[in-house]
């Protein structure tokens, strides 16, 4: 799925998503308007999360995880 679809899945559908570059147990999910959380419960500012994930490789390769 695309980056845009992954963001919508998290923010509108409440899903956890992972990218092909993530480890097998890694994911992110939306927490509120400004933060995501990861599989360890760490809060990640959205602007920081996407700030270091720029470029074509991050525009696709997303999936919903259980």
Model feature map: region roles:
Residues 2, 15, 45-46:
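Generic cytosolic/nucleocytoplasmic N-terminal low-complexity/intrinsically disordered segments
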Residues 17, 28, 36, 62-64:
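Hydrophobic beta-strand residues in large extracellular and virion-surface proteins
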Residues 14-20:
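A short, Trp-centered hydrophobic/proline-enriched beta-strand micro-motif
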Residues 55-65:
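Short, structured beta-strand segments at or near domain termini in extracellular proteins/domains
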Residues 13-14, 41:
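Short, flexible coil/linker elements and helix-boundary hinge sites characteristic
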Residues 23-55:
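Acidic, low-complexity, intrinsically disordered interaction modules
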Residues 1-9:
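Surface-exposed ligand/attachment interfaces on beta-rich extracellular proteins
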């Amino acid at each position: 799925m695309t980056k845009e679809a992954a963001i919508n899945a998290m923010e509108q559908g409440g899903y956890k998503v992972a990218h092909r570059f993530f480890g097998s147990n890694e994911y992110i999910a939306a927490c509120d308007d400004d933060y995501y959380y990861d599989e360890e419960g760490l809060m990640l500012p959205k602007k920081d999360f996407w700030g270091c994930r720029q470029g074509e490789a991050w525009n696709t390769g997303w999936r919903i995880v259980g």
